[in-house]
A protein has these predicted regions:
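Acidic, low-complexity, intrinsically disordered interaction modules
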Residues: 25-41
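Short, mixed-charge low-complexity intrinsically disordered segments
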Residues: 37-72
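Short aromatic-glycine-(Arg/Gly/Cys) micro-motifs in beta-strand/loop hairpins
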Residues: 2-30
């Protein structure tokens, strides 16, 4: 599969995102993300992070958008 894949790091929770939570799943300027151009790379890094003690992580495939998301 081609595309851009991310493993997100949520600044609010100070942890890698391993489930979709309303305040963390979408990439914002306050969060950082590990970006991969290939799914294989993302899976390799996910496995390393999980082996280092993180819970099961989610790999997100994201598309570029100009939609502004506001926190309430």
């Amino acid at each position: 599969m081609t595309g851009i894949y991310y493993i997100l790091y949520c600044a609010a929770a100070d942890a890698y995102v391993y489930e979709e939570r309303p305040d963390c799943w979408q990439y914002t300027g306050q969060d950082t993300a590990l970006r991969f151009s290939a799914l294989r790379e993302a899976k390799k890094t996910r496995k390393k992070l999980e082996n280092d003690g993180f819970p099961p992580l989610t790999i997100f495939k994201m598309k570029q958008t100009n939609t502004v998301i506001k926190k309430t």
